[in-house]
């Protein structure tokens, strides 16, 4: 595995740090997000990153808020709270930044988004990684980029297993002009195709392989079922990772299409002593 990844992972055991699981069914969700050297997020002294995790700790009540299958406990939802200027909004901005970079490339103004608490950070890489549960399997995708120089220096996609092992699907060490394909992406016939695409950007610090593999590659995915993990991860980030800001309206109001849910919303608002201007009871 490339050296740039700094996340400590825990395998399933008898401790409370149960992280890995192979889920039954088609669950899709964000498990963890890690970031460093971005806006207010400095590199930790030990070289790690700031982490947002949906992994549940010891739960004694409100168990209906927890998803578990006997191996892993995950929060169905989470809230981030803290003092003013503590970095809450920057966490959302970091997730949104990573999403936009994956889908569209580095956005305007990115060269100034490194953490400025230390002048040395200007030349240090910024780190972004998401762990997701996708179709019963657990993946980590991430990249490192020196924002001030608009240069990606590494990129990776790995499959995570319950025995604390990682199966490399692809890694790129752009600084040393090297890459590695593994797992289903190393399948005979497919690997030769991917070698061409990966080789073209072997030392290109301006491009992410995941984005390239989702541009006009319909024939590849039709011919190689194993290649679809690249399409599916990209599709999850594009279609399922929905990031909203406080001043941004939420477009999906399906929750309110059910009468009982609408009544529940009304009761909650009333409990705060806020009049809706019209009593509602269906």
Model-assigned labels for residue ranges:
Residues 89, 93-96, 100, 263-270:
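A broad, structural surface signal
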Residues 34, 53-55, 131, 144, ...:
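Residues in well-ordered beta-strands of folded domains
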Residues 20-97:
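Pre-Walker A-like glycine/lysine-rich segment at the N-terminus of P-loop NTPase domains
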Residues 35, 40, 130-136, 159-161:
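Short acidic, glycine-rich loop/turn motifs
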Residues 140-281:
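Electropositive, glycine-dotted interaction segments
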Residues 66-79, 83, 92-150:
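Conserved P-loop NTP-binding catalytic core
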Residues 1-27:
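Short, positively charged and aromatic/hydrophobic N-terminal segments
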Residues 48, 135-139, 166:
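Short acidic/polar mixed-charge low-complexity motifs
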């Amino acid at each position: 595995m490339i050296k740039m990844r700094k996340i400590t992972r825990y395998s399933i055991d008898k401790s409370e740090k149960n992280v890995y699981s192979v889920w039954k069914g088609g669950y899709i969700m964000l498990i963890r997000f890690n970031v460093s050297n971005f806006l207010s997020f400095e590199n930790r002294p030990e070289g790690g990153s700031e982490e947002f995790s949906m992994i549940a700790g010891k739960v004694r009540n409100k168990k209906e808020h927890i998803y578990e299958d006997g191996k892993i406990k995950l929060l169905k939802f989470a809230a981030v709270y803290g003092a003013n200027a503590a970095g809450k909004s920057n966490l959302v901005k970091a997730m949104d930044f990573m999403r936009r970079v994956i889908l569209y490339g580095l956005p305007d103004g990115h060269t100034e988004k490194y953490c400025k608490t230390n002048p040395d950070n200007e030349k240090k890489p910024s780190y972004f990684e998401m762990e997701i549960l996708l179709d019963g399997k657990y993946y980590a995708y991430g990249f490192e980029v020196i924002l001030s120089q608009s240069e990606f220096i590494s990129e990776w996609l790995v499959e995570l297993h319950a025995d604390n092992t990682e199966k490399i699907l692809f890694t790129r060490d752009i600084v040393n002009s090297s890459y590695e394909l593994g797992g289903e992406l190393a399948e005979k016939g497919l690997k030769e195709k991917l070698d061409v695409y990966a080789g073209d950007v072997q030392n290109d610090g301006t491009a992410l392989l995941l984005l390239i593999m989702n541009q006009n590659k319909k024939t590849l995915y039709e011919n190689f079922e194993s290649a679809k993990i690249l399409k599916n991860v990209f599709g999850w980030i594009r279609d399922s990772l929905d990031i909203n800001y406080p001043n941004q309206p939420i477009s999906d109001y399906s929750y309110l299409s059910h009468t009982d849910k609408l009544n529940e919303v009304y009761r909650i608002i009333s409990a705060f002593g806020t009049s809706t201007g019209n009593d509602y009871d269906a």
